Amino acid sequence: MSNNMRKLFSMIADSKDKKEKLIESLQENELLSTDEKKKIIDQIKTMHDFFKQMHTNKGALDKVLRNYMKDYRAVIKSIGVDKFKKVYRLLESETMELLHAIAENPNFLFSKFDRSILGIFLPFFSKPIMFKMSIREMDSQIELYGTKLPLLKLFVMTDEEMNFYANLKTIEQYNDYVRDLLMKFDLEKYMKEKGV
């Protein structure tokens, strides 16, 4: 199993998804139309621009945090603005890497399964999600992103993956490939090896 897919699965695993649930979700895959792919890319670009604004424009970050947080003052006092800036800088970089991966190989968004990738970015993009978080939950999310995400390099594809996506023709081929990777993947062993 390639390193990049392992990294992706480890992030998905952090969201409490079970291997069986992931395999089951593959049954629901269908080909993406050009319009659907464009919509996803637009979503990623919107996220990227938002994340960039958050760490380059102090006023914009302050306004968003005031608007997105239940208790703005307590969050800033407990966590601090610098941690948010660091995470938003990191997320800008990751969304750019994702856009580069898609540009290099459009089939990277071949399946609806790949939409789960966007979930990685949602906690720091979605007001409803951020608003529901306690200070402790927000701090732990910042810690997760700040320590794990830089190690994973999610969207740097190996030659094997580039070749696979370039030659991908059918959804069945994709399902078989990912199902095989999931069945072979040992999360506990991987996490232990990486010290994650």
Curated annotation (Swiss-Prot):
Changing S33N: In strain: NCTC 11638. It comes from the Bacteria. InterPro entries: CagS (IPR032020), CagS_sf (IPR038306). Pfam families: CagS. Changing D14N: In strain: NCTC 11638. This is CAG pathogenicity island protein 13. It comes from Helicobacter pylori (strain ATCC 700392 / 26695) (Campylobacter pylori).
